Amino acid sequence: MIEASKLRAGMTFEAEGKLIRVLEASHHKPGKGNTIMRMKLRDVRTGSTFDTTYRPDEKFEQAIIETVPAQYLYKMDETAYFMNTETYDQYEIPVANVEQELLYILENSDVKIQFYGTEVIGVQVPTTVELTVTETQPSIKGATVTGSGKPATLETGLVVNVPDFIEVGQKLIINTAEGTYVSRA
């Protein structure tokens, strides 16, 4: 059992028969009354997100999530296909369940498949990935790193804000947790 006050982003727990992943969690102390935990959560099975509050001492069953190394193969229609790199088993995951993760991975990228028992519940991508810029505004002469930046579309369709000196065709390192530009590769 885990108390609500110990829940952090990325953790998974069971509540009311649902498997829930914490997206955001914060303590809130109103002017009057007791402290509450404000949370943004996602139902792992349905993909729906919702906001809720809990008392800090409420207890939940922490879900045991196992991960296996895998490779992203391809996407067809509304299904993404992955292969376990140890057993060569293939997994089909609805695109709706891994939509955000697919913005950071290319075909043949290494990932980790997350399991709850025998049920595939998600994909864990590396903390940083290298992607190529496919579309952005032309560079401005004399641009510096301190400028406000410009939007750039990457090869997966992800749009990130980049410094003004970045050009089409350059490889960038992207932070997958924040969805932000880190540096040129």
From Swiss-Prot:
GO terms for cellular component: cytoplasm. Disulfide bonds: none annotated. One of its GO terms (molecular function) is translation elongation factor activity. Gene3D superfamilies: 2.30.30.30, Nucleic acid-binding proteins. The keyword Transcription does not apply. Keywords: Cytoplasm, Elongation factor, Protein biosynthesis. Pathway: Protein biosynthesis; polypeptide chain elongation. It is found in: Cytoplasm. GO terms for biological process: peptide biosynthetic process. InterPro entries: Elong-fact-P_C, NA-bd_OB-fold, Rib_uL2_dom2, Transl_elong_fac_P/YeiP, Transl_elong_KOW-like, Transl_elong_P/YeiP_cen, Transl_elong_P/YeiP_CS, Transl_elongation_fac_P. PANTHER family: ELONGATION FACTOR P, ELONGATION FACTOR P (EF-P) FAMILY PROTEIN. This is Elongation factor P. It comes from Streptococcus equi subsp. equi (strain 4047).
